[in-house]
Amino acid sequence: MAKAIPKKGSRGRISSRKSIRKIPKGVIHIQASFNNTIVTVTDVRGRVVSWSSAGTCGFQGTRRGTPFAAQTAAANAIRAVVDQGMQRAEVMIKGPGLGRDAALRAIRRSGILLTFVRDVTPMPHNGCRPPKKRRV
């Protein structure tokens, strides 16, 4: 019977595998739909540092689309990167949801200096036909 070959470096790790990087500047993406708000913090190259959404903060159902849920999600996403030394950030807001302003307010309150805020909501130049209106 073949013996199991021990893996190199499997005898207990002294430090964590992922080294904590110092990130002085980053990009905060806010995606606000009517049902949920997702906040993603990346470095300047686009690598995700931390993220949070209203769903991961414990809100369920229609409460995920509320401004308070968006505020909580933004605060959770930013708490991790402030510990890594982020001081300046750019903000990209996408979507028509209620959480746009609340998430931006939470970011401003966190103490990170915002270099600019840009609305990157995709707008059609009369592209596809929209779905038919609901009849209630």
Swiss-Prot record:
GO cellular component: chloroplast; ribonucleoprotein complex; ribosome
Residues spanning the membrane: none
Principal place of residence: plastid
Pfam family, one: Ribosomal_S11
Subcellular location: Plastid, Chloroplast
The keyword Zinc-finger belongs to this UniProt entry's keyword annotation: no
A molecular-function term among this protein's GO annotations: rRNA binding
Top-rank taxon, per record: Eukaryota
Keywords: Chloroplast, Plastid, Ribonucleoprotein, Ribosomal protein, RNA-binding, rRNA-binding
Listed Gene3D superfamilies: Ribosomal protein S11
Keyword Acetylation recorded: no
InterPro entries membership: Ribosomal_uS11, Ribosomal_uS11_bac-type, Ribosomal_uS11_CS, Ribosomal_uS11_sf
Assembly, per entry: Part of the 30S ribosomal subunit.
Family, as annotated: Belongs to the universal ribosomal protein uS11 family.
Protein name: Small ribosomal subunit protein uS11c
